[in-house]
Structures are given as structure tokens and as C-alpha cells.
UniProtKB/Swiss-Prot annotation:
It comes from Pseudomonas savastanoi pv. phaseolicola (strain 1448A / Race 6) (Pseudomonas syringae pv. phaseolicola (strain 1448A / Race 6)). Pfam families: Ribosomal_L31 (PF01197). GO terms for biological process: translation. GO terms for cellular component: ribonucleoprotein complex; ribosome. Keywords: Metal-binding, Ribonucleoprotein, Ribosomal protein, RNA-binding, rRNA-binding, Zinc. This is Large ribosomal subunit protein bL31. Belongs to the bacterial ribosomal protein bL31 family. Type A subfamily. Its cofactor is Zn(2+). Zn(2+) binds at residues 16, 18, 37, 40. The keyword Metal-binding applies. It comes from the Bacteria.
Length: 73
């Protein structure tokens, strides 16, 4: 590498929203804020969140189900 053309590669602390602090190195040279990390991400923790899709589908059908129906003769 050429001398004096590369940014300084410093040690920084990356802090997650859950409070986990990860020590890493970066050219950013400022503390980093993370949204998720391996301590709180559902993929790594095994805690999956399920959405209440059934209630939404029923609500949609009750509101708009009659628009697509054909009239019986």
C-alpha cells in the first residue's frame, strides 16, 4: 500500500438498539448505532414473530367481498 493516502483505520464501538456493544474497526472514526444485531435479530435468536394475517383477510372480505359477487337469477 502507498503511504499517506489511506484513511486511518480505528477501533470503534457499534451499539445496537438492544444495548449490545460490538467492538470493531472502521474508517468512520465515530461511534456507530445499529438497529439489529446477532443478539436481538429473530433469525439468530430463534424467536419468530407471526403476523395476524387471518384477521386482515376476513376484514377485507367483509368489506369488499360483495363487489366481485355475481347475482344469481
Amino acid at each position: 500500500m502507498k503511504a499517506d493516502i489511506h484513511p486511518v483505520y480505528e477501533a470503534i464501538d457499534a451499539t445496537c438498539s438492544c444495548g449490545n456493544v460490538i467492538k470493531t474497526r472502521s474508517t468512520l472514526a465515530a461511534p456507530l448505532s445499529l438497529d439489529v444485531c446477532n443478539e436481538c435479530h429473530p433469525f439468530y435468536t430463534g424467536k419468530q414473530k407471526t403476523l395476524d394475517v387471518g384477521g386482515r383477510v376476513d376484514k377485507f372480505k367483509s368489506r369488499f367481498g360483495a363487489f366481485g359477487a355475481t347475482k344469481a337469477k
